[in-house]
C-alpha cells in the first residue's frame, strides 16, 4: 500500500496556489433575436463599437452598423443560414482589416482579400484596416506627373495625372470598362501597380477582363478584387475599400498605383439595400443620408503623397452608370462633385461608330495640362477648341445649303480630326505615336486624304517613323518633349508620305 506523505501534498497545494493567476477574460456576448435578408438584430451587446466585427455561433462574421438603445443591427458577411433566433454572438474587439503584401500581384481575391482564383493561399505578414483615414493636406502634393491611358482622346484633351480622381460616366454598354482596362494595359513597363475592383458584375464579365489582361502580360502588376452579383450586399459594399487598402499598401511604400472601381453605382445600391433593411430613414432615390460620405471617404484616399512620405500616388478611376444619359441623378452628381473631372461616354456617339465614345464637350479634367508631358501640351492645345467648333458648325451646316469655303474647310478638317481620335479596343498608343497623330491632323497634313483612309494613313505614318526615322521616337521617349529636331523629322516624314499619297 502507498504511504501518503502529508508534506508532499501540502507542498503541491502551495505550488498550485503560488501559480494561480487571477486573470479574468471578459467576453462581450449577445443574443440574436431577429435574423434574415443578411441582417441580424442582437440584444445584449452593450460595449460594441460602430463597425466592430462580430462572430456568430456558426462562425459567420458580421459588422455592427446600427447601435440602437435596445439592440444592435449587424450586416452579415455570408449567407448566415445556420444563424437562428437565440444564437449567441461574440464581439471580437476588432475593426475590419485585411492582409496585405506583394504576393497579391497577379491574383484574383474577394472583398476580404481571400484568393478565389484557385492558385493557393497568399502569404502575408502585415494587415491594414479596410477603413483608414485619407492623407491630410500637408501629406499631399499637387498632381504634376502624367498617367498615360494610351487613348489619344483622353491623353490629349482630358489628361489624367498620378494622384488624380477622374470619373468615367455613361450609360450601360458604352465602353466604360474598355477605357479602364486599356489604361491598365498601357501601364505595362511603367512601374504602376493596378487594382481593378469589380462590384456586382457577372462572373463571366470579370473572367473576360482577367483573360484580356493575362493575354497581354498585364496580370503581373495587377490585383483584381471581385464581388460578383451573387455575393451578399455587405461584400459588394466592402469591395472598393478593400481595393483602396491594397493600393494604399503600395502607395505608402513610394510606389505609383491605379485603382479602378467598376462601378460605384452598384456599391451605392448594395449600401441602400443594407440601410433599408436596417430601417435607416431613406432620402432621395431611397438612398440613405450618408451615401455621399460613402463615396467621398473612399475617393479622398486617392492622393499624390509628399516627398517626405515617399512620393507615392494612388490614382482613382471610379465608374458610374447613368440611365438614359441622365448625369443629374443622385449618385452621378455626388461622384462628379467629389472627383477632379469626368470622362462622359455617350450612347449616341457610340452607336454612330465613334469609339471610344467620349463626348468631348462635357468631359473635363480639373487638373488640366499640369498632368501632360511637354510634347503633348505643345501639340494638343488647339485640338479641343477645333473639335468643339467643328461640332457646332456641323449642327449648323445641316440647315444651311450653301457654305463659304472657310466653313467647308473647317468642316473637312474637323471630320478628319474626329477620325484620328477613333481607336480600337486594347490597342493603346505610345506618346510619340499620339503626338505624330495629333500633329498631322492639326497642321492640315490629313486634309488631302479621304476621311475613310485617314486611319490607314496614320498606321502607315507610325510604321514609317518607327522604321525610317527611329530618332523621332527616341527623342520623345528620352525627353518627353517635342523638340525642334523632332518636329523637323516628323514634318519631313509627313511631306514624304503625303507627297506619295497625293
Curated annotation (Swiss-Prot):
InterPro entries: ATP_synth_asu-like_sf, ATP_synth_asu_C, ATP_synth_asu_C_sf, ATP_synth_F1_a_nt-bd_dom, ATP_synth_F1_asu, ATPase_a/bsu_AS, ATPase_F1/V1/A1_a/bsu_N, ATPase_F1/V1/A1_a/bsu_N_sf. ATP binds at residues 170-177. The keyword ATP-binding applies. It catalyses: ATP + H2O + 4 H(+)(in) = ADP + phosphate + 5 H(+)(out). GO terms for cellular component: chloroplast thylakoid membrane; proton-transporting ATP synthase complex. The record marks 363 as: Required for activity. It is found in: Plastid, Chloroplast thylakoid membrane. F-type ATPases have 2 components, CF(1) - the catalytic core - and CF(0) - the membrane proton channel. CF(1) has five subunits: alpha(3), beta(3), gamma(1), delta(1), epsilon(1). CF(0) has four main subunits: a, b, b' and c. NCBIfam families: atpA, PRK13343.1. This is ATP synthase subunit alpha, chloroplastic. It comes from Tupiella akineta. The gene is atpA.
